[in-house]
């Protein structure tokens, strides 16, 4: 459309039908110009012409709001701010990558790959230092976007992602799948980061530490208008879910990236296919050399097996693909002074020495603290207070002391002495044989461990106190209403109305849930105690083996190792826990408060038809809760594992079963669906 034509149209008495046609044409034109500018890097109109088209569309949409379309470029910034982010379950897990920190690591990865599938080529790309994002298009229109989160569940950031101008609200052309999930990195270019901090400096506001933090903070704004002002960018690096399955995709990773680009999605210009190992190392060195000149922050390069069929043969491990690796750049290093050491107590009782450093700028941030990990690390470094140390940001994230500078040690340097008593509760600090970490023996008595211990105690898989969420626990402890788990059972509804946003009705419901939680099982009770390395399965095995708490309390390490799946280390943790007077006092107080469970009867052989078998659950179960299914299988004698191996007897495959199903089929493991599982349970009631 020419400017003069637009002027005439806007000044005329336009009919609704004409307005709708013009608005659709303007939206399509502006979206295409966005792609030409941000993706193709080949704009065909000036900025002023683009602005003129946009203003025309804005005026028409104000006059005819009923014709605003979802992919209109005016809809990039939403209306009201959100109260919170909703959760989104990924259709396909967003896995992380394993790391290589040098040629030896990458060569070992290369050997593992070629041993499995023969010769390979790699699609190489910069590892952007931003935030992983999943974007779902349905019928070509952006439907939703989410953060990686824990890989299974992320946060809904759709409105914020729409503000990123390089991301098309509607895919280009018509040749795309009905559903396509695009994965990539949202990041803040260096120039945008500098401009953002300049604006903050002018307003005397807190500065962002680095572009990655700025990008993450910008994407997690509840008000998308703030995100829109931050000039974020995006590069696509992979496809996720594609429907229908029959849609013809490229046979290589590089070809699939070109498909994404043809649909209007931005893809890095630094991507290269390397056929030989030497070419991979040359690519790495080239990007490393040009790192400071690139318009965005990177912390390495990503190497992916280019052939999709080879990727599928290689498959996945629990948290990462076997066909890709992040080849990280060497961390940046600086020297500074160790001014002192503080000892922190973590939620599991781990006592960790933390170095207090003279502040130093390294790897893009100012570092004033670094973990010294444990006594062995202090001894290995030979470090003393007053030493000059070399600080590195390992992986460009975690500050780490890697060495001392002996020639700079002053005569006043002093030894680092580990405390004999917990700096929080005064209990003895102990270090079990074979363990690197020293721990406070206070257990449930220690204030540093108290909040997390009580959160765990009340959690769904433990005593399952409905309504007792993390924030409620924190308030109960902060207001000194609860000091130990047993105090939960002394709470009344009127006491809990002291909590924020807790009316009498909610408090009465919570009091009822606390009362109901007194009736539990021995397995749940043991899990709730938070004994180190005692998960649900181990707690169930301990309960089944000893049948009573009294028998378990006096069990020796030797007796404990006779329990299924309990090794020496776990046995030591259990014995150590029950040897601490503080912990026994808490247990006795819980029983005195009314916590109880039914007696355990030894199961007959007929009642455990799956004894000795290993089962695995995968995918979504529609009629059964995953934990209930697991518990029923264990009742029938099965061991329920988290991964498929040659020792797996049966896999239960729910909807959207992924890599576990593929591996089971590859190994010839028996596979059943949810209906068959329900039938099994019904037959053994």
From Swiss-Prot:
The active site is at residue 127. The keyword Protein transport does not apply. Keywords: DNA damage, DNA repair, DNA replication, Ligase, Magnesium, Manganese, Metal-binding, NAD, Zinc. It catalyses: NAD(+) + (deoxyribonucleotide)n-3'-hydroxyl + 5'-phospho-(deoxyribonucleotide)m = (deoxyribonucleotide)n+m + AMP + beta-nicotinamide D-nucleotide. GO terms for cellular component: cytosol. It comes from the Bacteria. NAD(+) binds at residues 47-51, 96-97, 125, 148, 185, 304, 328. This is DNA ligase.
